[in-house]
Amino acid sequence: MSEDGDICPICKSSRYLNPDMKFLVNPQCYHKMCESCVDRLFAYGPVTCPHNGCEKILRKNKFKTQIFEDVAVEKEVDVRQRVMSVMNKREDEFDTLNDYNAYLEKIEDSIFTLLNGTADEKDALTKEIEAYEKEHKAEIIANNKLRDEEDKYEQQKEDWMKEQRKANYLMAVEEQRAAQEDKEAAKRELVHQLATSNKDASSIEQNVQKTALKRSSARTVNFQPMPTSRYFEKVKKESSKPETPFTPFNGDRQIPALFEVQDHYDDKVIEPLAHDIQHQAGGFTLKAAYARILQQAFFGLGVDVQTELLAEENGNSNGTAVPVKTEEDPVKLEEPSIQVKVESTV
């Protein structure tokens, strides 16, 4: 805060001489003055703002501590809170998302007018908001109450998830410590058996490794991280028409599939990848790779885009592929599946 900001414009007191001095503002005009001036000037009721040129009538109970250093930001936050406490309709109260977005845009326009509009525009909009608040008082109170409950729910969810993350972290640390202890115990056991047993070293090492593996497996089963959000999942209202992007293929919704993945293919390109440790670490499997290749090969067979769009416009689309059966169509969609066996390199 600047040096001028540390001096009360009314009594000229300085925060340098009074470090505990607090500055207050009134939402009527947002002129700043110290707490002592507020107590002194407004002790006997409403008084005109003591700042030169300001004719606003101020009340003592309306003064509040200034949160933001910039008064313009302070004013915008207060105006936004007042407007949104009245215009507080929820998204589920509108038929379409466009209607809800238009309502949000109207809120922003109202806030902008109250901040930057002319005096006549501000007065007209203020009267309009007051009339709306009076007419829809019950709905406004209900929505504000519901919003407070949701905020409380979100706070509880955040606190609960924070506790779960902390508990999972402690469990992971404990599991890591136990794994290190088992590793050191296995080393000591190996040294002890090599020194005392008459068996060959390879068999002793295998037995020690088997024992260590059993301990590790048992510890992994016991170590189960707690869920982070399962008990706080919200039930979302399903819309009558899901807003999903249109795909001209619809291969991901063709049931049953037009192919069947075989257990083995004579493939010299993809098959060696199954033995690569880097691919194995990422979860690579041959069957999943072949299934993806065949899915791409059969993507959209038997689907006519124009027919599907026409069915959707007529309200008959159920989200599945709409095949067009012709005499030249080589794909028979009536069959549950088509056996496909790739003999050459995919």
Curated annotation (Swiss-Prot):
Record function comment: Acts as a component of the general transcription and DNA repair factor IIH (TFIIH or factor B), which is essential for both basal and activated transcription, and is involved in nucleotide excision repair (NER) of damaged DNA. TFIIH as CTD kinase activity and DNA-dependent ATPase activity, and is essential for polymerase II transcription.
Annotated segments matching region Disordered: 314-346
InterPro entries in alphabetical order: Cdk-activating_kinase_MAT1_cen, MAT1/Tfb3, Znf_RING, Znf_RING/FYVE/PHD, Znf_RING_CS
SUPFAM superfamilies from the UniProt entry: RING/U-box
Biased composition annotated in UniProt, kind: Basic and acidic residues: 325-335
Cellular component terms per the entry's GO annotation: transcription factor TFIIH holo complex; transcription factor TFIIK complex
Signal peptide: none
Superkingdom classification of source: Eukaryota
Name of the protein in question: RNA polymerase II transcription factor B subunit 3
Annotated localization: Nucleus
Residues spanning the membrane: none
Chief place where the protein resides: nucleus
Record keywords: Metal-binding, Nucleus, Transcription, Transcription regulation, Zinc, Zinc-finger
The organism of origin for this protein: Yarrowia lipolytica (strain CLIB 122 / E 150) (Yeast)
One GO term (biological process): nucleotide-excision repair
An annotated Gene Ontology molecular function: zinc ion binding
Zinc finger (RING-type) boundaries: 8-53
